[in-house]
């Protein structure tokens, strides 16, 4: 929720000052959690078909998973915003199709939420495309060729500690695994490939709006970019990309904290906030605190038509 509002306000501000701004949404549609998503939908499909089985502990339990499964079985096509239609065959044994269908389904849900808040994007970028185009593999090879990797414990490591300044004195305190013993890449590797792609498209400045749990990513991504740039013969600024890290918000409604968990399926959407408080009030509240500060969205306060509500003074 905060990402959308913070990013949109920052983009509008930069645009008003003469910057040429492009708003890009990076979809994390690859990796372990997406595998869990596909597995969860498959299990729900089998349950809807009458099979008696339980959802695994690492599955997603929300009702939205049932909705995806039901639409998949009904062979309803999904047309992701800015993408090609994905047709369902109803074959829940087709893991790849279920993965693509589920991702597209949730992309639309996210896009509808952002639209309700008045947030727009110029471009949509899929993490999975970095694998299908070979960008991840090429990035890793560029880093290897630059001499910034080594093998230990059956894994490939990036020598992040070789870089003493990764922007404003930032440096990593230990080397990081790039490729695990099972052959899969760690989560920051596609991030490096993505930012190489972005830099190659002519972007001289990139600002990522992410949660504070990504703090450790900054040094790893910048180290990967600096290493790859040696092989590619390009000069990438040490501070590329820049980051604005925000803490998650909690929601209070009726004087009580709304309990939220993506895995259990309990959550509040942006559309909920807009429905409860209105678009303008929601946007104002979401950017009314420093990004890295704890934030409580008091729905009842946001709806008040009195001087207790900060929006009242605008």
Regions found by a protein language model. Name each.
Residues 1-314:
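NTP-dependent nucleotidyl-transfer catalytic core
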